[in-house]
Structures are given as structure tokens and as C-alpha cells.
């Protein structure tokens, strides 16, 4: 199939492009953002930049929407309305943010659109009205078993941990003041100062490229995941694939993603601290639990399963539009 989309979340785009469908992207904006600019002139073989004129002459089979403004972009460039005369999926990456659990989704009651959620928790908490929904759990390329746990430190991987303070559980780091924490990610350099004086042992470890990040994470003995109100983070899945034991706040989708034997999982911070201390003190036990984490992540979040689920979703979207048109 020919799928029109925008490169909104790079990691998610990469997973989709691992499949066999053709993905179409409008050219970059004047600012240089968008299109296939992120690939630096070497995009995957099934990714193409196409003009609006080409899309009008040869419309895509499905448009994959991730932002509301893309609905108007389709009307503007293709002269077609998603969900009416163009099969459409709205990929909802996020948890609802207001009036939970009664939050109305922006495309609720649009029977011609299929909403795809990334977790069952999100599907449960968004009110989508008459709009059909399905869940496609993440698919993550296996970075390989790399865990060494050489450094008795915690890895904490969060983008914008200060701006997203309570959402990402950054405020909870103060409870882990007895442990050395290495923070990775966009704007994570702001975190050490933000948590002082309650935590003096948080260090910025870099905003690294994926392969460098995997190696750096795998050297830390435990992965710490404190997200309070987010969809399931890709970095947690990647940590598990690396073979890291994980200490996880039991919120949103964590109980489905993380077996208790994969490290520690609790909504009780005191329990989580005790378990984290034990994992740091016993590298062999950490390695054993990390292998459990890896098996669980590979089984649930494999790329082949992810791509198969998306094939079904694209076909369903086309059928939905035919039924309502």
C-alpha cells in the first residue's frame, strides 16, 4: 500500500519503514523541517518525498495522521478530506491530559477514521465516541543483549525531564537520593540542577545517538523508569531488550509491559527503593532478572508482530471509508 504520513516521532517512523509498504512524505518546510530531512539524503528504500501535485494525481491508499493540523494539510494539498474521501488513521501516541477519564478525543465521533492507540491503557481512558479504535503495541528493533551492569548506577532516559516534571516522574528522583543516577535525553542537562538540593547525585550523561545510548545504558546496573502519566516509553522497552533489570513505577501500561520478575515494579516508592538497592548490590541477580526482561520485551514488542498489526489496520481503514462514504 501507499501510505502518506509525516515524520513526527522518529523512532516510530523508523519502525514503520521496516515494513514493505511504501511511505510518502511531503517535501520539507522552508525551515528545513519535515519531509525526509532526518535521514540526511539516505532514506530507506520504501520512503519517498512527493509533491502535492503528485498526491492529487495519484492519491495514497491511506493517510496516517498524528496531529490535528494534518487533517487540514490533506484538504489543502490533496483536496480530499481524511475519513470521507481518503481512508485515514489517526495514530494517538499520548495519554489524555485533561478531564480524565472523560476526555473526548479530538476526532471522536468520526466514523470514517480509525484511531490507533499505542497502549490498551490509552484506549481505555480516551473517549472516542463512535470512532472505531484498535491498539497496536510498540514494535522495537532489537538492539541485542548488551548488558554488563559494570557501573553501579541507575540509567534514567527521559526527554525534557524538567518541562515534563510530574508527567515523567522527575519529581520522584528526590526519593532516590542515595543512588547515583545518570540522566540521558533531550534537555536532560537541566535535570541535575532542578533536583538539587534534594538529590545531589544526578549527572547528565548525554543526548546520544541510538547505538551510543544503548551501549551507555547497558553499562549501568539498573534502568529507572518513573513515568507517572505517559504512554509506554520506547526507552523502557529498549532497556529490557538490552537485558537490563528495570525498576519501574507501576503506572499506566507498566503492569502489562514489565513482569514483576524483570526487576522491580511497584506504585509504592518505598518498595521500589528497597528493590533498587538490592539490584544494585547483587549484579548476578540483576543479570538474571535482566534476561527475564529481555525475553518479555522480545515476545511482546517484536517488529514482525507490529508490522502485521499495521497491515491489518491499513486494510481496516480502507474498508471503514468505503462503508461510510
Locate predicted features.
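N-terminal pre-catalytic "stem/leader" segment of glycosyltransferase-like enzymes
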Residues: 1-76, 265, 303, 308, ...
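Catalytic core of nucleotide-activated saccharide and alditol-phosphate transferases
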Residues: 69, 73-163
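Conserved catalytic-core segment of nucleotide-activated headgroup transferases in glycan assembly
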Residues: 140-197, 204
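Short alpha-helical segment that forms part of, or immediately flanks, the ligand-binding pocket
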Residues: 214, 237-241, 252-256
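Aromatic "clamp/platform" in nucleotide-sugar-dependent glycosyltransferases that forms part
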Residues: 228
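Short hydrophobic beta-strand element within catalytic cores of glycosyltransferases
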Residues: 245-248
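Conserved acidic donor-binding segment of nucleotide-sugar-dependent glycosyltransferases
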Residues: 260-270, 278-284
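A charged, aromatic-enriched C-terminal amphipathic alpha-helix characteristic of glycosyltransferases
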Residues: 281-315, 319
Amino acid at each position: 500500500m501507499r501510505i502518506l504520513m509525516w515524520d513526527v516521532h522518529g523512532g516510530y517512523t523508523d519502525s514503520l519503514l521496516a515494513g514493505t509498504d511504501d511511505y510518502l512524505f511531503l517535501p520539507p518546510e522552508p525551515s528545513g523541517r519535515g519531509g525526509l530531512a532526518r535521514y540526511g539524503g539516505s532514506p530507506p528504500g520504501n520512503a519517498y518525498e512527493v509533491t502535492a501535485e503528485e498526491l492529487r494525481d495519484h492519491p495514497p491508499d491511506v493517510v496516517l495522521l498524528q496531529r490535528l493540523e494534518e487533517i487540514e494539510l490533506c484538504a489543502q494539498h490533496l483536496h480530499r478530506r481524511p475519513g470521507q474521501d481518503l481512508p485515514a488513521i489517526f495514530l494517538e501516541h499520548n495519554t489524555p491530559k485533561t478531564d480524565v477519564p472523560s476526555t473526548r478525543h479530538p476526532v471522536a465521533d468520526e466514523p470514517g477514521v480509525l484511531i490507533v492507540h499505542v497502549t490498551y491503557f490509552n484506549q481505555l481512558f480516551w473517549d472516542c465516541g463512535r470512532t472505531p479504535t484498535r491498539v497496536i503495541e510498540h514494535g522495537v528493533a532489537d538492539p541485542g543483549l548488551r548488558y554488563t551492569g559494570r557501573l553501579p548506577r541507575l540509567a534514567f532516559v527521559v526527554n525534557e525531564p524538567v518541562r515534563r516534571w510530574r508527567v515523567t516522574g522527575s519529581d520522584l528522583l528526590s526519593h532516590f537520593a542515595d543512588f547515583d543516577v545518570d540522566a540521558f535525553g533531550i534537555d536532560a542537562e537541566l535535570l541535575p540542577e532542578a533536583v538539587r538540593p534534594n538529590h545531589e547525585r544526578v549527572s547528565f550523561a548525554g543526548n546520544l545517538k541510538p547505538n551510543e545510548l544503548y551501549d551507555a545504558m547497558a553499562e549501568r546496573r539498573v534502568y529507572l523508569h518513573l513515568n507517572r502519566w505517559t504512554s509506554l516509553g520506547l526507552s523502557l522497552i529498549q532497556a529490557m531488550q538490552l537485558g537490563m533489570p528495570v525498576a519501574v513505577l507501576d503506572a499506566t501500561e507498566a503492569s502489562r509491559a514489565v513482569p514483576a520478575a524483570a526487576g522491580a515494579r511497584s506504585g509504592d516508592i518505598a518498595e521500589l527503593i528497597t528493590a533498587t538497592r538490592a539490584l544494585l548490590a547483587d549484579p548476578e541477580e540483576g543479570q538474571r532478572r535482566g534476561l527475564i526482561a529481555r525475553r518479555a520485551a522480545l515476545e511482546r514488542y517484536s517488529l514482525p508482530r507490529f508490522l502485521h498489526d499495521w497491515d491489518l489496520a491499513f486494510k481496516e481503514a480502507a474498508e471503514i471509508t468505503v462503508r461510510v462514504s
